[in-house]
């Protein structure tokens, strides 16, 4: 058995940010592809995003609530919340793309569907969601 002290908050390691080349469309002055930084969010933050993506109405059953979950919106909000570089909440950056929110900016900065999908998948991996999560998302979509 482990000593309970090993589980105390001050012993808890913080997840390391992940660097990821989300797209080849942005390069530095030497032509090197810029890497984006992804940082995991907390379970509480994830719950807030999930709630924002569910359209609950009074009288809905649990099954109806599950069916009202907007997976696409969830993926966009999760990816935007976990992206720490570039800063998707930067007003100047948003203005340059003509958008007003981080989720829309992310879609504009990753205009190729494959790049966007791979980025969302990398964000999910960074947050600890494995293959089962991806399968669950597909099940909800269908």
Predicted regions and their residues:
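Low-complexity intrinsically disordered segments
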Residues: 1-15, 132-142
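Short acidic, Pro/Gly- and aromatic-enriched capping/linker segments at domain boundaries
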Residues: 11-26
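Low-complexity, charged, repeat-rich alpha-helical/coil interaction segments
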Residues: 1, 25-26, 30
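Short, surface-exposed, charged amphipathic helix/loop patches that serve as local interaction elements
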Residues: 30-142
């Amino acid at each position: 058995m482990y000593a309970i002290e090993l589980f105390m908050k001050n012993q808890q390691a913080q997840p390391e940010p992940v660097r990821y080349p989300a797209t080849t469309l942005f390069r530095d002055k030497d032509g090197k592809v810029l890497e984006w930084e992804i940082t995991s969010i907390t379970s509480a933050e994830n719950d807030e995003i999930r709630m924002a993506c569910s359209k609950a109405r009074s009288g809905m059953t649990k099954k109806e609530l599950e069916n009202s979950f907007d997976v696409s919106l969830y993926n966009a909000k999760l990816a935007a919340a976990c992206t720490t570089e570039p800063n998707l909440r930067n007003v100047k950056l948003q203005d340059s793309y003509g958008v007003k929110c981080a989720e829309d900016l992310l879609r504009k900065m990753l205009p190729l569907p494959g790049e966007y999908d791979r980025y969302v998948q990398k964000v999910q991996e960074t947050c600890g969601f494995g293959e089962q999560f991806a399968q669950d998302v597909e099940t909800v979509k269908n």
